[in-house]
Structures are given as C-alpha cells and as structure tokens.
Amino acid sequence: MSNKTGGKRSATINSDIANHNMVSEVPPERPNIRATRTSRKAIAFGKRAHSMKRNPNAPVTKAGWLYKQASSGVKQWNKRWFVLVDRCLFYYKDEKQESILGSIPLLSFRVAAVQPSDNISRKHTFKAEHAGVRTYFFSAESPEEQEAWIQAMGEAARVQIPPAQKSVPQPVRHSLEKPDSENIPPSKHHQQPPHNNLTKLEPEAKTRGEGDGRGCEKAERRPERPEVKKETLVKANGLPSGPETASEPGSPYPDGPRVPGGGEHPAQPNGWQYSSPSRPGSTAFPPHDGDSGGQRRSFPPRTDPDKIAQRKSSMNQLQQWVNLRRGVPPPEDLRSPSRFYPMPRRVPDYYNPYSSQYPDDYQYYPPGVRPDSICSMPAYDRISPPWALEDKRHSFRNGGGPTYQLHEWKESTSYGRQDGTVWIPSPSRQPVFYDELDAASGSLRRLSLQPRSHSVPRSPSQGSYSRARIYSPVRSPSARFDRLPPRSEDIYADPAAYVMRRSISSPKYDYLGDRRPVPAGLFPYNYPSSPTVHDKMDELLDLQLQRNLEYLDQQMSESETLISMVNRMVENSSPRAHLFMQVPAYPEVFRDGLHTFKLNEQDTDKLLGKLCEQNKVVREQERLVQQLRAEKESLESALMGTHQELEMFGSQPAYPEKLLHKKESLQNQLINIRVELSQATTALTNSTVVYENLESEVSALHDELWEQLNLDIQNEVLNRQIQKEIWRIQDVMEGLRKNNPSRGTDTAKHRGGLGPSATYSSNSPASPLSSASLTSPLSPFSMVSGSQGSPTKPGSSEEPGPPRPPLPKAYVPLESPPTVPPLPNESRFWPYPNSPSWHRSGETAKGQPKTGYETSKKDPSQTSPLGTPRDINLVPTRQEVEAEKQAALNKVGIVPPRTKSPAEEELTPSAVVRRTTNGLTNGLSSRQERPKSAVFSGEGKVKMSVEEQMDRMRRHQSGSMKEKRRSLQLPASPAPEPSTRPAYKVVRRHRSIHEVDISNLEAALRAEEPGGQAYETPREEIARLRKMELEPQHYDVDISKELSTPDKVLIPERYIDLEPDTPLSPEELKEKQKKVERIKTLIAKSSMQNVVPIGEGDSVDVPQDSESQLQEQEKRIEISCALATEASRRGRMLSVQCATPSPPTSPASPTPPVNPLSSDRPRGADSSHTMRV
C-alpha cells in the first residue's frame, strides 16, 4: 500500500468501520455460523434507558466536566459529567448522579479538534465523528483538558483488543476460517505461519458503537464470512496467512508487515504458477510499492484468531436481529446452506499438504443459494423464477460441491468498480479465464426477470456467477443508473466497511454515491475491462428499465380503466345510485358555486398574502429611502458648512487642509449615499408598482365578489360564503390603509372603475365595520328585524326598514375639517377625523359597540335628529356633494364656530328631513342599486398624510385665533345677538361680533333666492376668500401687532352708547362713514367664511392669484389700524366729556347682512358685553 494510500487511509480509518453497538457481546452457543435468534435486549445504544450498561468493575480511564452540544439541533451546550470507561463515553448530569444520561461507544470514532468547516465558534472544542453516526461536539474548559480528552478518547477509539477468551469452541474456529479459500487463489504471501499469527479483525470493534446501518448490508449479505478479506488468504493455498494480510478496508487499525521483507513477493507454493493477469505479482491485498511495508509495520500485528469467534457470534446475532425485525424466515428454511451442504469440502489434490486443520464442516453455497441478507428482498417479496430453481437442482445433482470457475464481470462505472479478473481454483483443472459475457448474460437474465424492489437492492447471493462474488453489482431496476466517476470501492466486499444502518425503514439504498470510496488496491476482486461488455451492459440496463416503466404505466392505465368501469356499473345498477342521481344533494347553483368559491378562497388567500408581503416590502423600502434622504440632507448641510468655513478661514495656515480633508470625506459619503438612495428609490418604485398591481387585482376580485353577491341567487350558504370573502378582503385592505395612512391605501385612484366597492375605508358598504354588510338590502343575511332578515328574500321590495343612508360628509377621506378644539360641552357636535382619537371615537360611536353603532347609523328611528353631525349631514344632495368636492379641492376646511348658532338649531330638523328624503330618493329603491354613501364616482384625492393634516390643523387654529382676536378690536356690532343666547350656557365667556353675525348672515342668505343681486359683491368676496388658502406665516407680524394694539387703549363699557357733543366736520363724517362701511364689509367676510354657500360654490369663478391674497391681507391690516386709531381717539374724547350718547355710525350707513333680523332690537342692548376684554 502506497504512502499516499496509507495517508488517505489514516485519515478515514476510524470512520469507515462498522460501529455495531447494537449487538451485545454474547458468546456463541452453536458451532453453526448462524446462531439462533436473540432477543431484542441485545440492543444497547442511545440515551437514558437505551444507553449501554456501564461495567462497574471496569477502571475509569478519564472523567471530568465537558460541555456537549445538544442533539436537538439548537446551538446549545450542556455541561455534563463525562466518564470514559471500557472504550465507551458515559455522561451524567453531575458527578454524584448514578442514572446515565447517555452513552457514546467510541470504537471507530475519529476524535480531533474542530475545523473551520464545522462552524463552531466555542473555544476548546473537539469532536468525535463517524461516517454513519452523527458527529458529537465537546468543549473543554481549558486547552490542556481538551488535549487530554482528545488523547484519551482517541486511544479508546483505536482500541487494540488484547488476547483473551482462549476457550472459544473449536467448531467456531471452523466456522471462522472456512470461507477463506473458496474465493482467492494462492498468492505470494501465503507462506506466513499459522493461525495464531492471524491478524485480529476490526469487526470485533463492531460489536459496540452506534451504528448507522450501512455496513450491515454486508454483515447479513454474507454473515458467515465477515472477515472474508483477511481470511480468504489464510487457507487458499493450504497455508494459513500470517500478519502480512492487509487490514480490512476501513478497519480502525492497519495490520503489521505482511512478510519479513516488507515488500517482497515470495514464489507461489506448490508450484502454483499463476498470478493474476490483470495484476501481475499481486496478492489479494497487493502493496503498490515497497514502502507500504513500513506503513504497515507502524501498527501492531493482529493475532489471536480466537477473538474472531466472539466477533462472529456478535455478527450472527446482529443478522438474526435484523431478520427478526424484517420477518425473514429462520436459517432452517430451504435456502439455508446448512440444510444442503453439511459435507466436507472438496479441494484439489495439490492442496492436501497444506489443507486447513478444519477440513470438516466447511460449508459451501451452490450457485444462487446464499443466505438471505438484510440487503436482499424479503423472502415473502421474492419468488424464485423457474430457472433459478432449475439451476439449484442442477447444482445439487452435480455433486453437491462447488465448481471452481472464473467469472469475469465488467462492472458498470455507476458502481465505481475497478476492472480486472478474479482467480478461482477449480478442483479438476488449472485456473483459466472464461469469456466475459458468461457471467454478464446470466446475471442480466436474472435482472430482467426478478421482481422490482424499491426499498432494498437485490441480494448478492441471487446470481449464478462465481461464489467469489461478494455482492451482485447488478441492482434492481429501481437503483440509480446515473454515471458516477470510476472509483475503487470495496464497500460491498466487506461488512466492516459498511456499518449498521440508521433505521430499518430509512431509505438508505436510494442513492449509492454517498458510500465512501476506498483506495485502490485494497479490494482484491478486480474485473476485466471490456468496452463491448460495458456498452452492452448500458444498453441492456436501459432497455430493461424502459420495459419496466412501460409495464408500470400500462398497469396504471388498465387499473384506471377498470376503476372507472366499476364506478359506472355501480352507478347504473344500484337503486340508491339512481335515487341520488334523480335527486341531487344540493341545488345545481350551489354545487357549482361552492367548488368555485373553495378555489376562490385559496386564490384570495394567496393574493392577500402577496399583497401584505409586498406592503411590508414597500414599507421597509420607504423607511430606507427616508433614512437615506435624511443622511443625504445632513451630508449636504455639512458640506455647505464646510464651504462656508473654507471661505471664512481659508487664509489661516493648516486650517484649510483639515477642511479640505473633511470636505473630501463628506463628498465621498455623499456619493455613496446618493448611489444607495438611487438604488433604493428604484427598488421602491418597482415595489410600489407591484403593490399597486396586486391592489388592483384585489380590488377587481372584491368587485367581482360584490357583483356575485348582488346576483339574485336564492342561496343563503353561497351568499354567506361570498360575504365572508368580501369581509376578508376588506379587513386586509382596511388594515393596510390604517397602517399606511401616508400612502393612501383606500384605492382612491380605482374608484372610477371599481363600481359598488370603490373605497375600502372602514365605512365601505360591504365592510365588516359598516352596516352595509349587515343591513343592506344586498346582504343575504340581514341583522335588522323585519322582512330584511329573511335570507331567502334579501331584496324584497316590501321591506319596512329604510335603506342604508350614505355616510356623513365628515367621513369622506378626501379632505377633513380642521381640528380646532371645541368647548367641552360641545365636543360631541364636532368630531375631528384627523385627531388621534378620531378612529376610536368615530368607529365605536363614543363607546358604543360597533354593531350598535352601525345599526344606529343605519336606522334613523334609533337616532335622535340632533344627535351628531352625521345626523345633520346624513344624505347630501348632488349639489352638496359637488360643493363638498369643490371645497375639498380648494383645501380650505370648514372653520367651526365656537358655539352653535340658534339659526343652525332651527334649521337642523328641516335639514334632516330634507336630506333624509333625498337620501331615500337617491338610495336603494331596487335590488340592483346600492347606496352610494359618500363615495364619489369620479375622480378623488388621496388621503392626506399625517404631516399635511398637522399642517392644516396649525393653519386653521392660527386663523381662528387671529379672527377671534381681531374681532375684539371692532368698535361696533352691526347685529345684536339673538334672544336665544342663554341657551348655550357659555360660562364667563362673551361672544365676539363675528360669532353673533353668523346666525344673522346665515338667515339672510337662506332667506334670499339664489338669483338675488343685492349682496352679490360681498358674496363674491366671501367666496373668493373661501377658496383662498392664506398661509399662517403671512400673519406672524400682523397678529402680534394686532394683539398689542388694544392693550394701549382703555375702552369703557359706555363707549358704543356715547356720541360726542361736538359735531364733526363733513370731511370727518365722510371719512367715518367710509370706515364704518369697510368695517361692516370685513365683518361680513369674516362671518361668511364659516358658511358654505350651498349650490353656489361651482358657479363662482374666483381668481386664485397671490396678488388678490396680498390685497385682501393689506385691506384687513388697514382696517385693523383704522379701528385702533378710531378707538383711541374716541377713548380720549370720552375721558374728557360724558355727554349725550350718539351712535358712532351714521343712520344712513347700510348694514345689509343684518337689517332683516335686527330691526326689532335696540342696538346697544348688549354692547357692554360685546367689547369687554
């Protein structure tokens, strides 16, 4: 064996060997090789109850604390107390505990430190690995302990069994050595002296250890010859082979020197003139070069063949245990060789001088009669074809003994065999080479006729070629025929190379490529290389596989035809079948629709899952883009500061260098950030497109389901299924909309084409949070009492309950009113959708359950007409909807008054009646229509983001406070307050002039016809101001100026009722009259900002340029200054003289907005309260 080969073997020597800890070391009780069945108590491996029993008398090799990686797959390390006794590692919870947590037989394990490929980051870690068992990882507390454990465990794994148990029965010795000479011709190394030098075979190590179930393929394939590799040389020439025989493939310890000379090849004994033609001068285990002797001499020689008996008995027990598990018949059946061949063997005459000392009871196997192995098909699954029985009878008639022949076999490269011939002695003639096709044809004939076995390949015993065949290379057609690179594997030749399989039922033979290769030269049976046989083999195998597959396909097709015929016969003949055919179990519509909706349910689940997943992706990408943008802006600002510093301090020495270095670093970072930002933006765009497509699909699916729900299908179950699907979709969409308010997931862009389910807000008609899905006439199972509750007649025209009224305008997500906080006692009148608690208060109806809230929204009989604004604004007419849309597009919300005007209260009942009537006319009058609610069929605006909403809140608050404080400076109230003022219970608060004017102005405007021209100019100005959005920062300086001006003037309560005695000049009167007119105009403007001109918003064409805004702003500032000046002058005059009161305004001064309502009231009745600060 070469150094290269030896090196390779040394690396894998401990991992290739069977580690049969499943079989206890029970001495054999029969001379027969196949011992009786043993009980299942022979199994001892694993953890706790399945762990091995510790020998209390055995000395403790090493003990200590180690960390062991948990076997659960989790990277968890458990501290355990480990004790190494008798080549087995036991571990406990602590040193005082007696119950064993587990045992690890270390035989044939390879113990070494961990490698980087193991991905173990813990310090002082080492491993014990085996080819067929999982790798155990241990961690010590110091490197010294690690080295000590590695050394101790390594020695236990490389155990050399001392000579013992010399009292092995003699028949067992017969059984140990009988299979030797039947396979291998005499070689040059067969001159070694006798049996007591016979090397110890590694399978003794297989009596213990955690096996993985691969090697026992050989162990039971030829259970009587587990050491065939070694002992085939022992008596092949009549001379027992000495320690020169090579170690078994995969044995944990190589053998000693084969011959005294190490690499010499003595002459063949007894005139044997033949050496293997394909391997000149080779033995069964030929060394490749002379230095292999040194390699072998480095290991102790194997002696004491008596130990083999113990190992053999263990292997027999293993075989019987596996047979017992698989239900294989006992060895006394027809195929047992002991039944046919209890006769002495026949050997050539020239073998007699060197014959074995055990000439008797050497049993042979006839061609095709080998004991069953675990790798063969079960006995009940294999029926011998006639030719097999014929061959068996023929072999029995021909003398009962084996005929030594040479069969040459070209193995397919898929089994990785080396090519060569096998020498087999014949009793009647010198060895010759037979034609290669002899064995191939016979074996292929058996392959084509034997039944398929999907689980286990065929046994090597089922072939008529040579008994030297340790295994049959021709597997069942279910085996894989993919071409693997040629390699020299002796894994089939020796059970030691194939350890016990992991599980009896595991699919371990499906793939042959994971079997470990063995270096060339260790396998003595080489087969000849012949391209013709090789090609013919491939063709025959492919043809046979194709035939088998075609046969299976034909059987399947015939079975399907037969099944369908039987079904038809049953259906046509059975009276019950006729009855069921006549009376279908379900209506046809339901039967078809149920299956459809089962499919739709799966599609909906997949689609909604994709939508949510894509939404998460988009949100993460948005967050990344925002983060990158913030970083970019910070870098740009830092660079800007650096540029400024360079301009300022560029002349200072050494300072510009630092700035330049800093600038360069910032520029590099900025470039990287911009690259990342561009990539993230592109990814976000693509993800958004995908998300929108998915959203469109969900919307289309929702519309389709809604249309199917609207169909006149009188089926409650089907309608419930559809309704459930709609709810599922809307739940997801509403959740996405609420979680992503900035992106506007209410699908406003699809509203034009979505039809009945345009919006996915929480008030969607089919939403589970709204009342449409419960009480709409389209709903198949209404929860409202009356005929609406009948699921079979969901659309009956005589239903007593009114149709669902559309949602109030405050719910429309296009635009929201400002969030001026109302008074505590008036908060219920003004909910603000943009406030954080809006969704909670709005959806739950101020603490009520959602169902009750939906029912109260639905049924006017359960709600008071003056309850909430959703009752006031129940059903907007078309003009109101258009006006509301226009107002939303102008981005100016309705500024609510601080108190509710009496005119509004007086108007509320009629407005409710009128709008409810319109809602009845515009709502559902037939089955095909559904309430439009507040959904616009045309274009819409996506919901504002949170930042925009907060900005609007600040603007409206600032504007409201400005208007209120400016009103405190006005000298007079053009309209006295109505008589219903005490009904509002405003404590310690006096209403300002513009609040008093609102009711009068609204009454005047509502009393007039739309075509009136008396107040056209103020209306145009009011509409223009209504459409303008004045930014609050424009008032920053002016508000402070206006707030500071009244503090400098003391205005007494009697100011408005007093008139100075001194008459004014005509110029002063004209100027004063002009100022009063301007003041009244301003009052009209400020008061009309709170009124929406219903029906007039679309007809007014108002410019939106910034110049008009600035002009109006300047006009207001001038009026404020004039008012302050006038008040100051009047205050000074009143402080000197208190004479007859005279009104500050001329009797001729017009007050158009308030005259119709204020003629019956004294002007100064409430003036003292009006101007009180």
UniProtKB/Swiss-Prot annotation:
Question: Where is the PTM Phosphothreonine found along the chain?
Answer: T868, T908, T1045, T1140, T1145, T1151
Residues that bear Phosphotyrosine? Y492
Q: Name one Pfam family in it.
A: PH
**Low complexity bias: where?**
761-782, 789-799
Which residue ranges have biased composition labelled Pro residues? 815-824, 1141-1155
Q: InterPro entries, per this entry?
A: PH-like_dom_sf, PH_domain, PKHA4-7_PH
- Regions of biased composition (Basic and acidic residues) lie at 201-233, 940-952
- Tell me the PROSITE patterns matching this sequence: PH_DOMAIN
CDD domains recorded: PH_PEPP1_2_3
Q: Which residue intervals make up region (Disordered)?
A: 1-39, 163-346, 737-872, 888-984, 1093-1114, 1130-1173
Keywords from the UniProt entry = Phosphoprotein
Ranges where the PH domain occurs? 59-158
**PANTHER family named among the record's database cross-references:** PHOSPHOINOSITOL 3-PHOSPHATE-BINDING PROTEIN (PTHR12752), PLECKSTRIN HOMOLOGY DOMAIN-CONTAINING FAMILY A MEMBER 6 (PTHR12752:SF5)
Q: Per its record, how is this protein called by name?
A: Pleckstrin homology domain-containing family A member 6
Native species: Mus musculus
